Amino acid sequence: MNLKNKITTVLLGLFLTTVSFAQTAKPTEYLGIAGQILFDKTSYNLAWTSHPTDNYYKQEYLVKGDIIGKFKKLVLLEIITGKTKLKDVVAVKVTELKKIKASSPIVNYETFEKDGEVMLDFLVSENTPDGKYLSIVERNVYRYKSIIDKNGRKGILLFGVSERAYGDDIDKFFPNLKAHRFDLINLVGAFEIPEITIAK
């Protein structure tokens, strides 16, 4: 399996962020983060985790009352360990978005680079079954950075925030995004990411 295929298999930031299945048991903490994540003065609780391969970890956090698959705002952390380069991870995601945009014009994205980190701001959507209307619009701001955890393990970390609108609320979503787009970008960029200890 070449590097590109390997990254694609465990791609950081999958399209329509959560295609996650509900977990009936308490989610496993893989990244050594104690308790909640406080983002923009709001507490997010660990709601779902996954460790499908030996070098990939994903954790999703929701506010109380939201559920996976029907959230309004979600915070996520993903890590791929090993010698993968940050620019390769971002490039795979951008390539994915370009392919989706070819058949879905609403898809849009922009990247920003600063201090060795990369931020990706992108918009995706999902249509109703008949294809006539938008059923979900999802805006994501992802922040990629190289890390070394407490035990010396190297990897690429993604910290991201996803915002969704459904059905009739989509009409209000776009004007609000236009007026306040950089608010979320600045918040994600300034967020102090918790110290990570990757599970062995």
Task: Give the residues covered by each predicted segment.
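Secretory pathway targeting signatures of secreted, lumenal, and periplasmic proteins
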Residues: 42-82
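Short, cysteine-centered beta-strand-loop-beta hairpins and adjacent loop/turn segments enriched
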Residues: 67-70, 127-136, 167-169
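Bacterial N-terminal signal peptides
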Residues: 9-19
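N-terminal "mature-domain start" segment
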Residues: 23-54
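Mid-chain, structured segments of secreted extracytoplasmic proteins
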Residues: 71-110
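Signature of long, low-cysteine stretches enriched in small and polar/charged residues
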Residues: 99-146
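Bacterial N-terminal signal peptides that target proteins for export
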Residues: 1-11
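Surface-exposed amphipathic alpha-helical segments
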Residues: 153-200
